[in-house]
């Protein structure tokens, strides 16, 4: 079983491309670390690989609490965040990932960590009639990842989600405009449709926004139209 766990950890390190975590892996095979810390790491990985994420969090948290300066601790920090993500405890996962980035800003796992923060927000995107905060936050996070690490594979993965974020945001903006129009709040509606047109021209709402802009302008005086423009 321990061999299976070690293989799982090796796969994790290979996928992350993280030198610091690889050093952790090297340390795990050495003699300088506490057997108890090592056992917590192995048991935590065993639980994680088996999908027992709550148990994994418990083991890794014990490792952090009892051996905060252990070379295992960095692995525990990351797997706590990953476990929360798999449990869909997105708020806790975001906090853990952000703490990792803050504590280890030069760690090579940071692109993965930023990507996971974006995924936490992205996975909460609902229908266009719901709060668009997750879409906005996912978009901003993936944009930050692309800017900071333009050549990283996680930046490329994040960029693939940007269109979905934008479509959710613009769909909500358009729907609010339609609501205002039907409520005869034409100036407010016009403002929404103008925003769709100017800020999001290429995501499928261009023609529909133009049609509503014409209908709103027909209901407004020149002075009212000028206020919006």
Regions found by a protein language model. Give the residues of each.
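Alpha-helical segment of the N-proximal tetratricopeptide repeat
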Residues: 33-69, 82, 86-87, 126, ...
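Short solvent-exposed coil/turn linkers within tandem alpha-helical repeat scaffolds
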Residues: 66-73, 101-111, 129-132, 143-160, ...
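Bacterial Sec signal peptide processing site at the extreme N-terminus
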Residues: 15-39, 50
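Alpha-helical linker/edge segments of TPR/alpha-solenoid repeat scaffolds
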Residues: 86-91, 119-131, 164-179, 215-229
């Amino acid at each position: 079983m321990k061999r299976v766990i070690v293989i799982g950890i090796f796969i994790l390190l290979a996928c992350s491309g993280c030198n610091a975590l690889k050093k952790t892996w090297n340390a795990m095979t050495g003699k300088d670390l506490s057997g108890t810390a090592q056992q917590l790491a192995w048991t935590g990985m065993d639980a994680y690989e088996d999908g027992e994420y709550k148990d994994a969090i418990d083991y890794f948290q014990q490792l952090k609490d009892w051996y905060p300066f252990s070379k295992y601790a960095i692995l525990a920090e990351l797997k706590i965040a990953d476990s929360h993500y798999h449990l869909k405890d997105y708020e806790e996962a975001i906090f853990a990932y952000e703490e990792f980035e803050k504590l280890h800003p030069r760690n090579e796992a940071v692109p993965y960590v930023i990507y996971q923060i974006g995924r936490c927000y992205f996975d909460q995107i609902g229908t266009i009639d719901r709060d668009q905060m997750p879409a906005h936050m996912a978009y901003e996070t993936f944009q930050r990842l692309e800017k900071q690490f333009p050549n990283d594979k996680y930046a490329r993965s994040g960029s693939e989600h940007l269109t979905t974020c934008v479509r959710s945001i613009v769909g909500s903006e358009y729907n609010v405009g339609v609501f205002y129009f039907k409520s005869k709040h034409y100036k407010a509606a016009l403002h929404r449709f103008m925003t769709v047109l100017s800020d999001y021209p290429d995501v499928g709402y261009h023609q529909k926004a133009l049609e509503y802009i014409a209908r709103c302008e027909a209901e407004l005086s020149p002075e009212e139209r000028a206020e919006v423009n």
